[in-house]
Amino acid sequence: LDLERMKTVLQDEAEIDQRIYTFPTSSIEEGGKKISYFDYISSLKNPDCNEALKRVCSRIDLDAIHNFLEGVPELLPIQREFYLTMLTERKEKILDYSLKLLMEQEQHTSPMLGM
């Protein structure tokens, strides 16, 4: 995106959400159609993906990402804000949301301890 488009996206939650839920799409196809990351990950239908979700979520350090972006002198402030916003929103709305669903699913399907 050009700088003006980045500003527009950052000012509109619907634009941000479109970049989370609608595109980009993954290279994974179902029924000949590329699927969204959100739909695939939050479906919890792939056990390998679910295990990767558990491993990855705890390792994402948004502060470290912020510090990294701050250290790239070629980036303009609007670019830093855009990238950090998109990464933060995608983590929260795709990964954290899906992990919460997974934890709830596992809690309901595993036998209660101590009974």
Describe the residue ranges of each PLM region.
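C-terminal catalytic region of ATP-dependent kinase domains
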Residues: L1-M115
